[in-house]
């Protein structure tokens, strides 16, 4: 996915009220960005470092600028826009980058499924194949060289694991796909120290037949895309 128009940059001052962040531009002026990330963004905030943001020409938006990337102190990059994970996953599936998810005829987004009033991120269907239900999660939490998910207690994430297990019990294929938007994460594990129930459910889901995949993003201020598989430690 290319960033069009090109991203602009500034210096992070602060994130607050969950969905807002103030940055300083090169001329010394300050603007407020929309922060499209519902998580805690634990270990992803580096005041004084460079951020990259997009700008919308929609006059109805209260905040025209959206935070896209965060530069780390060691010159790495973090994808802040967690909502882009589904788009990145769809793009990678269509291009055949995710080898485990090739060979299907159709791809649908946000289809109702399960018995807990959920919508699946991606549904793949093909002739003479079980339907494949894919939940996509953005992973950005890095601690002691290990990537973790979630970065806060996630009741929604727990629900999605239950839904995936239900799909397997109905004879379908179910996949949990971690989209790694942190250049220094090379393996992903459940954050049992943050959400022990999620970690417990993930192990149960794997035993029930849910597949878990993780793919790293290649990121730059000009584009972002899924590039290669990485290790999942359940």
From Swiss-Prot:
GO terms for molecular function: DNA binding. CDD domains: SfsA-like_bacterial (cd22359). InterPro entries: SfsA, SfsA_C, SfsA_N. It comes from the Bacteria. Belongs to the SfsA family. This is Sugar fermentation stimulation protein homolog. It comes from Shewanella baltica (strain OS185). The gene is sfsA.
């Amino acid at each position: 996915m290319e960033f069009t128009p090109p991203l602009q940059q500034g210096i992070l001052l602060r994130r607050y009220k969950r969905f807002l962040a103030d940055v300083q531009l090169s001329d010394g002026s300050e603007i407020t960005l929309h922060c499209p990330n519902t998580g805690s963004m634990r270990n992803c905030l580096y005041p004084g470092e460079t951020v990259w943001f997009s700008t919308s020409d929609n006059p109805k938006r209260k905040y025209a600028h959206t935070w896209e990337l965060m530069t780390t102190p060691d010159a790495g990059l973090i994808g802040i826009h967690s909502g882009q994970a589904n788009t990145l996953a769809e793009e990678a599936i269509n291009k055949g980058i995710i080898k485990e998810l090739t060979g299907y005829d159709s791809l649908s987004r946000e289809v109702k499924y399960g018995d807990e009033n959920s919508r699946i991120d991606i549904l793949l269907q093909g002739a003479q194949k079980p339907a494949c239900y894919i939940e996509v999660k953005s992973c950005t939490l890095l601690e002691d060289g290990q990537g973790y998910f979630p970065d806060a207690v996630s009741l929604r994430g727990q629900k999605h694991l239950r839904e995936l297990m239900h799909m397997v019990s109905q004879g379908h294929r179910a996949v949990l796909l971690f989209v790694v938007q942190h250049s220094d994460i090379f393996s992903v594990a459940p954050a049992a120290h943050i959400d022990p129930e999620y970690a417990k459910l993930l192990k149960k889901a794997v035993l029930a037949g849910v597949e878990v995949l993780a793919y790293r993003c290649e990121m730059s201020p000009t584009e972002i895309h899924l590039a290669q598989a990485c290790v999942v430690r359940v």
